[in-house]
């Protein structure tokens, strides 16, 4: 099992989004993921989730794993769900993933476990 974690100030993501708008969103979220955004906290949570997912691979966001190799969605209970691209799943021999996102006191945090 491998674990990745990321924490970010919601205000930091909010400032970047207000400055760059949809261009910022398009750099790390696909259209289905953009629909999940309800407020700055959920946007920051999505950022943290993708960063944590890349760190769980031991590589971070880079040429080996782009933001678009990681997809965040919701399950039937509205809990966050993580899916890697087929290439990442094969290259890193991933059989299971688990994602948790939380927001509190101006921060968003995400933890990813990969088996």
From Swiss-Prot:
E.C. no: 2.7.8.7
SUPFAM superfamilies recorded: 4'-phosphopantetheinyl transferase (SSF56214)
Localization per Swiss-Prot or TrEMBL: Cytoplasm
InterPro entries, A to Z: 4-PPantetheinyl_Trfase_dom, 4-PPantetheinyl_Trfase_dom_sf, ACPS, Ppantetheine-prot_Trfase_dom
Keyword Cytoplasm attributed: yes
One Pfam family in the UniProt entry: ACPS
GO biological process, one term: fatty acid biosynthetic process
A molecular-function term among this protein's GO annotations: holo-[acyl-carrier-protein] synthase activity
Main localization of the protein described in the UniProt heading: cytoplasm
Catalytic activity: apo-[ACP] + CoA = holo-[ACP] + adenosine 3',5'-bisphosphate + H(+)
Superkingdom of the source species: Bacteria
Positions of Mg(2+) binding: 6, 51
Key words of the record: Cytoplasm, Fatty acid biosynthesis, Fatty acid metabolism, Lipid biosynthesis, Lipid metabolism, Magnesium, Metal-binding, Transferase
GO cellular component, as recorded: cytoplasm
KW Kinase (keyword) present: no
Cofactor: Mg(2+)
Role noted for this protein: Transfers the 4'-phosphopantetheine moiety from coenzyme A to a Ser of acyl-carrier-protein.
Family according to the record: Belongs to the P-Pant transferase superfamily. AcpS family.
Protein name from the UniProt record: Holo-[acyl-carrier-protein] synthase
Organism: Campylobacter jejuni subsp. jejuni serotype O:2 (strain ATCC 700819 / NCTC 11168)
């Amino acid at each position: 099992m491998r674990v990745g974690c990321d924490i970010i100030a919601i205000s930091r993501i909010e400032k970047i989004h207000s400055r760059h708008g949809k261009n910022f969103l398009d750099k790390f979220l696909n259209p289905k993921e953009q629909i999940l955004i309800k407020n700055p906290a959920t946007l920051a949570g999505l950022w943290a989730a993708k960063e944590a997912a890349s760190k769980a691979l031991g590589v971070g966001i880079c040429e080996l794993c782009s933001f678009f190799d990681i997809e965040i969605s919701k399950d039937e209970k509205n809990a966050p769900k993580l899916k890697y691209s087929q290439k990442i799943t094969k290259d890193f021999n991933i059989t299971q993933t688990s994602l948790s996102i939380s927001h509190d006191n101006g921060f968003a945090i995400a933890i990813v476990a990969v088996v």
